[in-house]
Amino acid sequence: MNPTHVIQQRLEEAWSLAEVLTAAYDAFDEMLSAFDRYQNGPGPFYAALIMAGPAAAGGRNTIGMAPSLPPPERDGPRSPEQVDEPSAQEVAGAVAGLAALAARKLCMAATAANSPADRSACVSGAQYADEVRAFMTGTGP
């Protein structure tokens, strides 16, 4: 199972505000990692990857400022997984799905957040996630 699918599963299973924030932060971080792997090569998704990068970074940074985001766990360095390198089209599809799920979960978390700062982070994070999804599906600005 590749990292994108692992994070997507964690995001699907997240229910508490802290779980959603943690999984959404990791989702944005994984989006940025995926973009880094494909940004140097020409291809049909090159422009979308370049355009979606700032939105993913903005989402990660916004979620990172949420008061209810727990401190990161220190498990030590992760060993790289051996996975087949997906095509840029497969990456775009996986990132679009992850971004759509993040947007939905963050919208749900925003309604349950007690703190205005948490609510704002969830709403802004959902907007950034939707922007990433739009770029990856070709429906962006």
Language-model region placement:
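Short, flexible domain-boundary/linker segments around small modular repeats
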Residues: 1-17, 75-87, 130, 138
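Leu/Val/Ala/Ile-rich N-terminal alpha-helices, chiefly Sec-type signal peptides and the beginnings
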Residues: 1-42
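Generic structural concept
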Residues: 21-28, 32, 53-56, 60, ...
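Alpha-helical segments in soluble extracytoplasmic regions
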Residues: 37-76
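Residue-level recognition of alpha-helical structural elements
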Residues: 41-45, 91, 114-122
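Amphipathic protein-protein interaction modules
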Residues: 62-115
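Preference for long, well-ordered alpha-helical segments
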Residues: 98-141
